Amino acid sequence: GRNVGKHFRPLRVTPMHQWNIDHGAKMIEVGLYQRPWYYPKENETLSDSYIREASTVRKTVGICDVTSLGKIAIQGPDSTEFLNRIYSNGFSKLQVGKARYGIMLRDDGIVMDDGTSWRLAENEYFMTTSTGEAAKVMSWLEELLQTRWTDLNVNVTSVSEQWAGVSVAGPKSREVLNNCVDDSLVVTNNNLPFMGVTSTFLKGNIPCRIARISFSGELAFEVYVKSDFANTMMDLLWENAKKYDGCLYGLEALGALRVEKGHVTAAELDGRVTIDDAGLSKMASTKKSYIGSAMRKRGVLKNNDREILVGFFPTNLKETFNAGTIVCEKNNIKGQGIGRITSVTYSPELGHWIGLGFVKGGLDKWKDTNLVGADPVRNKQMNLKVVSPHMICLLYTSDAADD
């Protein structure tokens, strides 16, 4: 029947699924989707592949299928007010043709999800959510409009299946897009600044949406086309990326790039983290009310001894460590310790393993202090140093300021 096996929990694929496989992708399940994990060359291992892919993105350009992100069309005269209520940061002054990174909180003040919203017109937005939380966010928005804010004139529609998206990232990403759009002036720095949004055409008269958004810290763009044009878009972008010795990159390389920059994902935003814990408190508006704004100020969530996002280096740079490691003081290696490691990767940029995680008191309390990572599952311990979560210098800054 429908309650067992694949009928109960179907796998979803992006419109480029077969294209990715034909170009060597090894797939992995993420939020019910099959996504490219890595693209091995010859006898490369997973580690070989993602390190090469991440290095290529930093040096030239890479293309990544991001279609699995949730996509929601928000339309109506009260759309801006609606976004201003659900996001912790301000949206009332976001201009048409700009995107903004936003963070949604639950009623209890804990982070629910993060993503970007693009203002396409005065009363129209294109929202992206994380892959894993897309259905939850969609249901949440519908619930708010149907039960709390019935006076708002807003329509929300899931368009996740209608749009196919890729990230084009790296120093040569603009050159690649220049060769792929009908009008190369569209993606110049003046016409498409950081967090800028535009609607244009790819060669072949393919309508598309482009935003200058970076998840890796490099110059990067997100490009969306109607799903029917997905493979044509991939052919066009890949043909031009190869001219700059670019690569296709998967989820593992994407993870390495984001850990180097200190960007959070579901590994960090696991349902018990506040916006302050994630080091994003400056994004919380002080000039408006929003979902979770009152509850996030509760004493238990503002405690100075809460676990705060930090970066981790092994004291011995030749050592490796794992996500799930418990962080302890040297003379008190027991129990739940003082923190935890949520994400690890080998950093091609730094040449050693790095991690993101949380520690009580945060960077201010433990900066450059040697702590111990206890990994009872693997029966190992290692010495760790607490560093800034932004482990390589940020190249671009966000305009997601308080309105």
Task: Give names to the regions the model predicted.
Residues G70, I74, M112, T128-G132, ...:
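Short coil/turn segments at secondary-structure boundaries
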Residues C64-D78, W118-F126, V166-V168:
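N-terminal glycine-rich flavin-associated loop
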